[in-house]
A protein has these predicted regions:
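Carbohydrate-binding surface patches
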Residues: 93-131, 135
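Glycan-recognition surfaces
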Residues: 1-63, 90-91
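Acidic, Ser/Thr/Pro-rich beta/coil linker or hinge segments at domain junctions
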Residues: 138-160
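Active/binding-pocket-proximal capping segment
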Residues: 66-72, 117-118, 127-145
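Acidic/polar loop patches that form or flank catalytic/metal-binding clefts of enzymes
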Residues: 18-19, 57-70, 76, 83-87, ...
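C-terminal beta-strand-rich structural cap/linker in extracellular carbohydrate-active enzymes
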Residues: 158-172
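Edge strands and adjacent loops of beta-rich recognition modules
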Residues: 73-103
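Structured core elements
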Residues: 17, 47-52, 99, 110-113, ...
C-alpha cells in the first residue's frame, strides 16, 4: 500500500494534502457501472487520519455513508488535525507503519496503524504516555472477518484502560 510509503516520501518535508475517511468502498453504489473498489477497510480509513499528517482535513465520503456508521464517524469528528508531538513507533516502508501523535494543546494521544498487503501485528509499548497518568484508549479496529474486498465495513470499537506501563496489541 502506498500509505505505508508516503510517510517516508511526501511527508518527509512536512504535512501534505491527503483525504481519508471513505466508508463505502464499492464505487458502484454511487456510480453504477463503475466496478472498482477502494482497497481499504473502514477501520483503516480511520487510522489514516493519524498516520497521514494533513492539517486541513475533511470527510471524503457522502453524508449518507457516514449516517450508516455514526459510531465510527465519531472518530472523524473527534480526531485533531494538528499535533504537538509525533512518535513513529514502528515502521517498514511498504509494509507497515504505526504512529502516535499528541493533539495540539492537550495531553490526548492518538495512534494509527496501517499495513500493506501482508498485514502486520504489533505489540507496542505505551511508554511515551505521561507516567502515573491513567488513560482510556478507544480502539477502532478491523473485525476478525474484515477484508477490503469482501467485508470492508466490519469493525469493532473497544475501550481499554492504559498507562505508560501498558502494552497494546494491534493488527493491521
Amino acid at each position: 500500500y502506498h500509505t505505508t510509503i508516503l510517510p517516508f516520501t511526501r511527508l518527509i518535508g512536512g504535512p501534505m494534502d491527503y483525504t481519508p475517511g471513505i466508508f463505502e468502498m464499492d464505487c458502484s453504489k454511487m456510480n453504477p457501472g463503475n466496478t472498482s473498489r477502494v482497497r481499504s477497510t473502514l477501520a483503516r480509513q480511520l487510522a489514516l487520519y493519524v498516520t497521514m499528517y494533513s492539517p486541513l482535513q475533511m470527510a471524503a465520503d457522502v453524508p449518507e455513508n457516514y449516517e450508516r456508521f455514526m459510531d465510527a464517524f465519531q472518530f472523524i469528528k473527534d480526531v485533531p488535525v494538528d499535533w504537538d508531538e509525533s512518535k513513529y513507533l514502528e515502521a517498514e516502508p511498504g509494509e507497515y507503519i504505526t504512529i502516535a501523535r499528541r493533539a495540539k494543546g492537550t495531553g490526548d494521544w492518538y495512534m494509527g496503524c496501517t499495513a500493506g498487503y501482508n498485514g502486520h501485528e504489533s505489540d507496542l509499548k505505551l511508554d511515551f504516555l505521561t507516567p502515573g497518568k491513567k488513560y482510556e484508549a478507544t480502539i477502532y479496529a478491523d473485525a476478525k472477518d474484515a477484508h477490503w474486498e469482501t467485508n470492508p465495513q466490519a469493525y469493532t470499537i473497544t475501550t481499554k484502560k492504559v498507562t505508560s506501563k501498558s502494552r497494546l496489541k494491534l493488527k493491521a
